[in-house]
Amino acid sequence: MTHTPQSGTAYRARLEARAGRLAGPTANLAPGHVQANLAILPADVAGDFLRFCQRNPKPCPLLAVSEPGDPALPSLGHDIDVRSDIPRYRVWRDGQLAGEPTDVRDLWRDDLVAFLIGCSFSFEEAMLDNGLPVRHIEQGCNVPMYRTSIPTEPAGPFRGPLVVSMRPLKAADAIRAIQVTSRFPSVHGAPVHLGDPAQIGIADINRPDYGDAVEIRPGEIPVFWACGVTPQSVVAAVRPKFCITHAPGHMLVTDLLNSRMAVL
């Protein structure tokens, strides 16, 4: 995959996160660059989690996997340190959220393996380029995300509900969004559901499980995409002894280009 010089906006964003000066959501940050979800697990369960991602490519499209104990990800960009280059992390112990630090270097171990998973923020650039509105960017907030009643395909101990992100669109725009996002299978691809949220187990569209609620205007329908926060719902269900993820909406900004993610 092609990536940009280290002097680009993506590298600067990582340095800002590393220095503790970037702590908010990364939507629309470093335009043109692929952003990634994160899951870090001990090596003894990493093989099962790899199979989980392979069996669930819509919510968990793998971009890279680190070597055990190695925080570098050279295939994704220059000088990446997965322990510090994300604005906010989540630390899980026995399936319970134990903290949201901005740096996990003090928690790093030689047996930890990092999984970087494609993020829908990449296809949002293509949506904007095609004149499609992205409401959470308009409102300056995080994308709304919901746990659903749709099961994932299990692998070893890893199983749990699919998490989806939502963007409200008019019907004609929703059709165009399907066409646009279908070109990006490595960053979740086409929607998994349109319309009635109750059909996928969402009781209240105005109360997302992650992120922020956004306005749904008259004439719009909710459009749902598989989401890379799915591993966090799986962590809650599986309750591994130790796990680190990104905080929802707080991604690793890579040097990879969104334009290189398209398949057509």
UniProtKB/Swiss-Prot annotation:
Pfam families: D-Glu_cyclase. It is an enzyme of class 4 (lyase). The keyword Lyase applies. Its EC number is 4.2.1.-. Keywords: Lyase. One of its GO terms (molecular function) is lyase activity. It comes from the Bacteria. Belongs to the D-glutamate cyclase family. This is Putative hydro-lyase Bpet2233. It comes from Bordetella petrii (strain ATCC BAA-461 / DSM 12804 / CCUG 43448).
